[in-house]
């Protein structure tokens, strides 16, 4: 269990340091095209590989540019992580776009559209929490 805690601690430190480096250390303009957030950091048990999930607020082209810039800076980031975290061998850094927020927004949009369609058909009254077919009478 101590190994798991160490991996979690290293992942948290990597997240902190990479966030700082994204603001002040990476000079590649592609990284600064959109609003970038690190959503998760996964580190392998042997601390040799690190996958950093990022969310980029912006158009698809901006997301691609940011990801390209981050991948191009991965060698620099690896060296900085090794120096800042005083690790003999810093993990290989790979960036991956986190589409979780995008998917969540899409699902919410679909649910809202479904509710609008049901209200237009008269299946449920507007602003009602009552489900169609339920026998509950609104209180009030």
Curated annotation (Swiss-Prot):
Alphabetic keyword roster: Cytoplasm, Ribosome biogenesis
Ranges of Polar residues composition bias in the record: 128-140
Highest taxon of source: Bacteria
Residue runs in coiled coils: none
UniProt-annotated location(s): Cytoplasm
Transmembrane segments: none
GO biological process, one term: maturation of SSU-rRNA
GO CC annotations on file: cytosol
Positions of region (Disordered): 115-140
Region forming the signal peptide: none
InterPro entries: KH_dom-like_a/b, RbfA, RbfA_dom_sf, Ribosome-bd_factorA_CS
Gene3D superfamilies linked: 3.30.300.20
Cytoplasm keyword on record: yes
Listed GO MF terms: ribosomal small subunit binding
Complex formation: Monomer. Binds 30S ribosomal subunits, but not 50S ribosomal subunits or 70S ribosomes.
Family: Belongs to the RbfA family.
Function comment: One of several proteins that assist in the late maturation steps of the functional core of the 30S ribosomal subunit. Associates with free 30S ribosomal subunits (but not with 30S subunits that are part of 70S ribosomes or polysomes). Required for efficient processing of 16S rRNA. May interact with the 5'-terminal helix region of 16S rRNA.
PANTHER family reported for this sequence: RIBOSOME-BINDING FACTOR A, CHLOROPLASTIC-RELATED (PTHR33515:SF1)
Protein name: Ribosome-binding factor A
Organism: Synechococcus sp. (strain CC9605)
Taxonomic path: Bacteria, Bacillati, Cyanobacteriota, Cyanophyceae, Synechococcales
Gene name tied to this protein: rbfA
